[in-house]
Structure formats: C-alpha cells, structure tokens
C-alpha cells in the first residue's frame, strides 16, 4: 500500500529497486485501497487511479515490464506457510507472504530484505533472518 498512498514510510518503500510480492498481493493491495475508500480516506476516483497504478506494476503493459516479481502460490508454498503459522502465530495471508519471501531467499540469498509494516509479520520476518525495511516503524 505504501507504494500507492502517502502513508508514513512511503518514501523508503518507493525507493526499493526490486519488489518481490506473493501473488496474494493481487487481491490484498486492491482490498486495502478499497477499504480506505469505505473508511472515507479516499474517494472513488482516487481508488480507481491507485488500483490502476497497482495493476500496471503487477502486470505491466505492452510498453513496460511489470515492476513486481511475483511469487506464485503453490501447494508446497502453502505447506511452508502453514509451518509459519505454527512457528510465529501469523494470520494466513501473512504466513503466505513470509513463506514466499523465504522461498525467494532460498533461490537467491541476495534477497535478504523484507519490507513490511505489520508488527507481527515484521517480528516473524526478523526472526527468520531478514533485514527489515524500514529498519524502524
């Protein structure tokens, strides 16, 4: 959400060169945007603009590649996420996000940063050895 709304911490997130997301972001980000609309924090036009920007980042278009590298939600990833629920007491979607990050790091150890603002997910990612972005919230 920090990529699309000027919330605390947005500058740090927007400065990231590479953004890897779980395929769940396809639902989570628009959900967060529309939740802000229902709460009166955004009007419909702003929400449509933000969702469109997210869609472009997620899918790309004929003139640009997607901004995100997307991790598919597979059976083995869900098994790993279930372990993260047991290990850290995470909510289901947060466990999938952490399992996705762990899978990427296993393939490329240079992927050692984890951007997150949810305190429970941040704590779990830190315990899993990720460098947290931003360093403080």
Feature map (PLM): residue ranges:
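Acidic catalytic patch
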Residues: 55-88, 95-100
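Alpha-helix N-cap/helix-start capping motif
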Residues: 7, 23, 75, 118-119
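Short, well-structured N-terminal submotif of metal-dependent ribonuclease cores
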Residues: 1-26, 31-50, 136
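Short beta-strand scaffold positions
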Residues: 21, 72, 92-95, 116
């Amino acid at each position: 959400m920090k990529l699309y709304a000027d919330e605390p911490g947005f500058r740090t997130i927007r400065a990231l060169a590479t953004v890897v997301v779980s395929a769940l972001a396809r639902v989570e980000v628009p959900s967060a945007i529309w939740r802000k609309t229902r709460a009166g924090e955004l009007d419909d036009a702003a929400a449509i603009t933000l969702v469109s920007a997210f869609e472009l980042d997620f899918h790309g278009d004929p003139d640009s590649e997607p901004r995100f590298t997307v991790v598919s939600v597979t059976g083995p990833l869900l098994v790993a996420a279930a372990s993260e629920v047991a290990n850290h007491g995470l909510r289901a979607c947060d466990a999938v996000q952490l399992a996705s990050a762990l899978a990427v790091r296993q393939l490329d150890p240079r992927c050692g940063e984890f951007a997150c603002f949810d305190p429970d997910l941040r704590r779990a990612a830190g315990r899993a050895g990720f460098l947290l972005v931003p360093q403080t919230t």
